Amino acid sequence: MLKGKTVVLGVTGSIAAYKIASLASMLVKQQCDVHVIMTKNATNFINPIAFETLTNHKCLVDTFDRNFQFHVAHVSLAQKADVMMIAPASANIIAKLAHGIADDMLSTTALACSAKKIISPAMNVHMFENPIVQDNLNILRKYDMEIVEPAVGYLACGDTGAGKMPEPEVLYEYILKEIACEKDLKGKKIMVTAGPTQEAIDPVRYITNHSTGKMGYAIAKRAMLRGADVTLVSGSVALAPVPFVKMVPVVTAQDMFEAVSGGFPEQDILIKSAAVADYRPAVVSDEKVKKKDGDMAIALERTTDILGYIGEHKKPEQIICGFSMETQNMLENSRKKLKKKHLDLIVANNLKEKGAGFGTDTNRVTLISEKEEKSLELMSKEEVADEILDYILQMNQVK
């Protein structure tokens, strides 16, 4: 995703400067062309040689370095950059950028750079909360620079509060969001459902299924990276939240129905990959049901058909994609579901196929629309997600 991309990292004087070495290493491992510019104060916290070793490029500090090959360095780097991140960003560099001051290599390059700029403030909590600093950050936002909100915690100065630079893994996600993919879904609002639902029997037990949510989370991530405004309605799963996605946690099928039906009118696309219970206990015990002699029967009642409801209430320009997991007659059963629920697309897979189904990192699916069927090879779930999004994008262009 990041191969061949040029990332310029700006490092200012902060105890958090050492963490950027880890970020540079992460980017280089993804085959990024990484360049680092440091302020003079930053060199008191980490030696430029560390960055030169990691990136295989000279770390720039002095605008007038006579030992560096002349390309008007701040201009050449600014033109090459796909994205520029300043982290940690001191109150000083924030003020310089806000007021157009270019008096060192970093500030000069930043002002000459037309690529997206991501700023990660790191400072004492009282400095960060100072109205002057906040005004300067708002100026940067006005000029379309993205501000990474600092983490809250114990600071090097001994205070506790906002001001900590987020971990390198978080900063990496900001860079990934910006340059990993072409933004062909920009402006689209996409709702994705993922994971299982849980239908309580009593306070201890519930009815559920084997869904892990991996497919839905992969779709949400890829849609976000491609520029969509994504809402992820998720059942209980053991997955980390998808960054930069609106998360709506649910437990029961009724919870999911309310979340989807309430949010869908504002969406362009619904991709419903969640494994929702078709039935729930008709009566839920307030106390734990005790074991007794003999058998026990649980009366079940139907849950609301979410796809059926949405299919009946969708606008002509909206697109609905459902999922169909089968163990037999996959194509026939999936096409029936497509027609009955008024879907535009259904993603079908066979649970009995190796590498397809619950809990795996791969899937093998067939995309079924009214006019055609497109069978895909076994691939990663993120690759499947892109295939689904590509297909929907083509359908959207026809509508």
Model-derived features with residue positions:
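A cross-family phosphate/adenosyl-ligand binding-site feature
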Residues: M1-I118, N124-G213, Y217-K399
